[in-house]
Amino acid sequence: MIMKTYFSGVSTLGVHSLATEDYGFFPLSVDQKTMERMKNVLDIPATQLNISNSSLIGSLCVGNSNGLLVPNITTEKELELIKMFLKENSLDVNLERLKAKNTAFGNLILTNNKGCIISEELSRFRKTIEDVLDVESGVGNYAELPTVGSNGVATDKGCLVHPLTDELELEWIQDILRVDYVERGTANRGVTSVGACILANTKGAVVGGDTSGPEILKIEEALDLID
C-alpha cells in the first residue's frame, strides 16, 4: 500500500520523519488523522517528537529494527522520550547518541535490517554504526554524492536510488543491502533525493504529495510493494 501526503504543505517527508520495519518517528506538526493513516500504511507504532529541538528527524537520525543512531545534539528530554516509546512498545532497539562532527546521520547512512551503506564522511565511525544497527556495512558514495542516505530509500526487499547511480554502483548497493531489487528513480515530480521524499518498509510506503503516478509505479517496483 502506498499513501501520498504532505507535512504542513511540505512534500519532503523523509527529511522530517523516520520509518523502519518496526517503529516510526514523525514531527510534531503532523495532524492526528495523517499520523494514524501513516501508522496503518506502514503497520508500525509511531510517536511524534523533535531531535535537537528540530523537526529534521529523518536528516539527523538513522535506524533499523536493531538500532537507532541519534546525533550528539539530541537533548536529554528527547532521548528519554525515545527510550519511553521503545519501552512502551516492547522494542529491543540499541540507542546510541553518536559524537560525530557531521550530525546528519539520516543523510549519510542508508540501511535496512540486512546491511548499511555509510558515507565516506562517517567512515571513522564504521564499527560503532555496524554494532548499533547490527549489520555489516560498505563505505562509499554513489551517483558521485556523499549523501547516500537522502539519495536512497531501502527496505528488506528492495531499494530505490538516485537516477545517476551507475550499474556497478547498483550491484554494489544490492550486494551490501542484500535485496532483490535496486532501481533508479525520482519522487515529488523529479526530485532525485528519493530518501528525502519517501518513508517505506516491506509493508507499505508513504510518499510526498507531489509524487506522480509513474514515480509511484517505479517505487512500488523497486520496493516490491506490488500486490
Curated annotation (Swiss-Prot):
InterPro entries, A to Z: eIF6
MF terms in GO: ribosome binding; translation initiation factor activity
SMART domains: eIF6 (SM00654)
Function per UniProt: Binds to the 50S ribosomal subunit and prevents its association with the 30S ribosomal subunit to form the 70S initiation complex.
Protein name: Translation initiation factor 6
Similarity annotation: Belongs to the eIF-6 family.
One GO process term, biological-process aspect: cytosolic ribosome assembly
UniProt xrefs under Gene3D superfamilies: L-arginine/glycine Amidinotransferase, Chain A
Keyword Protein biosynthesis attached: yes
Keywords: Initiation factor, Protein biosynthesis
The UniProt record lists the keyword Heme: no
